[in-house]
């Protein structure tokens, strides 16, 4: 089964039509809807996408949560293994911790038997770190 792990920037771009990456984000989300594809988001990255909507009010937050449910995006709970992996990535790279969690979630999925894992991110540093730390 294929897996798409979202970095928060893709879903923020998807939700905000004024975002510079909106069109590309919509395309990435649509591509992730292919049959037999799981969609994942780290709980840390979930909190990132909620910040703006929480500031905007309950309706905006509810809109985000409805979108996640509509597209069956699984929120991956941060357990000790994922936290250790994110910390190791953070220690070895210049990535900020939330970005390390996006990458750690993708690598975690790969280590748990998923052989077709894609990390959806607009952050070149995240994608570069993924290629360096976990080349396919």
Residue ranges and their predicted role:
Residues 1-40, 53-66, 115:
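Short, well-structured N-terminal submotif of metal-dependent ribonuclease cores
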Residues 1-2, 55, 61-76, 127-136:
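Extended low-complexity acidic/polar segments
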Residues 1-3, 103-136:
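Acidic, PIN/NYN-like endoribonuclease modules and their adjacent C-terminal/linker elements
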Residues 17, 71-92:
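Acidic catalytic patch
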């Amino acid at each position: 089964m294929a897996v798409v792990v979202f970095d928060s920037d893709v879903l923020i771009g998807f939700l905000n039509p004024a975002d510079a990456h909106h069109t590309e984000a919509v395309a990435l989300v649509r591509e992730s809807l292919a049959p037999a594809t799981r969609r994942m988001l780290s709980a840390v990255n979930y909190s990132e996408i909620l910040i703006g909507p929480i500031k905007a009010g309950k309706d905006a937050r509810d809109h985000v949560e409805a979108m996640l449910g509509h597209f069956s995006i699984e929120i991956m709970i941060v357990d000790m293994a994922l936290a250790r992996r994110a910390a190791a990535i953070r220690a070895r790279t210049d990535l900020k911790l939330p970005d390390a969690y996006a990458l750690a979630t993708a690598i975690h999925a790969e280590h748990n038997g998923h052989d077709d894992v894609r990390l959806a991110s607009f952050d070149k540093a995240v994608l570069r770190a993924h290629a360096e730390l976990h080349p396919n």
